[in-house]
Amino acid sequence: MSLKPLLLIPALSAVLLLSACAGPMPKAAPSEAWIGLKEEAPNDLMAERVDGKRVDDGRFFEVSPGDHRLDVTLFAEEPGDNDQQNCEGRVEYEHFKAGERYTLVESSLGSTVRASLLDGHGKEVAATQDFNCMPG
């Protein structure tokens, strides 16, 4: 018997365990604005705070209509480099609407990292300044 098939068992177990932890995405409340997150591979973008208060689920933001400040953390990896950077960013937007879906899209060019807040029509309505990055 070959050793390779036996090595697949721990790898598959880890994948299944990690996917089970996340759970399904909750349904968006019609009275709230929903902000999804989108990052460039291999980076991970996580929701951290709304108006200074920690969020329960780092995969999205859900806010009441109006003015809010969203804080995010980006775990950035350079292709071919094992060093990870932890980057913090903030976006402020005054016109969140109930029932509207938004997307916070991370993009990077060289060492410059930013994120754009897009409304449901794909129009940029706000953006972060450059992220503050430190070695992770």
Label each region the model flagged.
Residues 21-136:
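Short loop/turn and low-complexity linker motifs enriched in small/turn-promoting residues
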Residues 1-24:
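Sec-dependent bacterial lipoprotein signal peptides
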